[in-house]
């Protein structure tokens, strides 16, 4: 009967993981995140496409998506003596649901935010928070998003390996954790190749923050700079190929056009 309950937990967590907030948010804006940038419906692509505010909102929801099923599993299965294995069953399942959603033809995101949510339950929450803040700060400083995200996964995995109780279905937890960590690395294989080739796409959080909160140049000044220098790179995020698609010459009211420039 306990195995049956764990199977039900796995199925429910997987289906819960099918919810992709990046797609929901972009559709609410009458757009499709999968048609922008890397095409990945995740936080980094949301940052490049819709800006800092929407990226943080999306990341928060995705982390909560990882927290909810794992926390419920921990509490519900505690009296059965299965809280540890239940956390890993729920965590792996929700991440699988995010990466391979059945309702989106098994084409989803890369699972890092959901893994972060799972880590908030598998580890003491303050430990996961410290790791998250450190990795986020690293991305802000370096603008290399993939190192920050993969760094979080590897650091969290290492600490979890130390904390898992071997006497409480520990070998199953080790297998589950090793599997999901390897899977996340695999779906990031393109990012890893670009990192070694020095061609990884930048993740300029500072520029996105300044743009959202209007701490840098005004839109009018950016438009004027684009008019005078069609090949200029603004705030480190707008590239030449994007500028070619924006017909601003001779148009006085251009703020709307600048909003539609996709940040890569």
Where in the sequence are the language-model features?
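Helix-coil boundary and interhelical linker segments in multi-pass alpha-helical membrane proteins
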Residues: 1-8, 70-89, 120-127, 161-176
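Cytosolic, membrane-interface loops and tails of multi-pass inner-membrane proteins
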Residues: 23-55, 108, 193-216
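Short, non-helical or kinked segments that cap or interrupt transmembrane helices
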Residues: 32-43, 102-116, 144-155
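Interfacial segments of multi-pass membrane proteins
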Residues: 47-50, 73-76, 93, 111-142, ...
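Loop-to-transmembrane alpha-helix initiation sites
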Residues: 127-131, 145-152, 168-180
């Amino acid at each position: 009967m306990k195995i049956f309950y764990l199977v039900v937990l796995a199925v429910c967590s997987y289906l819960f993981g099918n919810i992709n907030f990046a797609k929901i948010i972009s559709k609410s804006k009458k757009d499709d995140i999968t048609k922008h940038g890397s095409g990945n419906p995740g936080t980094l692509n949301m940052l490049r496409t819709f800006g800092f505010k929407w990226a943080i909102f999306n990341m928060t929801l995705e982390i909560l998506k990882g927290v909810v099923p794992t926390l419920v599993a921990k509490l519900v299965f505690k009296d059965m003596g299965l809280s540890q294995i239940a956390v890993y069953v729920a965590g792996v399942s929700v991440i699988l649901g995010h990466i391979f959603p059945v309702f989106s033809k098994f084409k989803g995101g890369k699972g890092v935010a959901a893994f972060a949510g799972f880590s908030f339950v598998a580890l003491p929450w303050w430990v996961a928070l410290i790791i998250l803040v450190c990795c986020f700060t690293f991305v802000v400083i370096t603008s290399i998003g993939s190192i920050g995200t993969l760094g979080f996964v590897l650091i969290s995995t290492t600490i979890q390996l130390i904390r898992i109780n071997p006497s409480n279905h520990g070998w199953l937890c080790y297998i589950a954790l090793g599997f999901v960590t390897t899977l996340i690395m695999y779906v990031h294989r393109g990012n890893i190749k670009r990192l070694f080739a020095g061609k990884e796409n930048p993740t300029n959080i500072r520029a996105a923050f300044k743009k959202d909160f209007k701490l840098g140049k005004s839109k009018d000044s950016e438009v004027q700079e684009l008019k005078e220098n069609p090949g200029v790179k603004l705030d480190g995020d707008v590239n030449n190929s994007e500028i070619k698609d924006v017909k601003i010459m001779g148009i006085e009211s251009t703020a709307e056009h600048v909003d539609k420039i996709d940040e890569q």
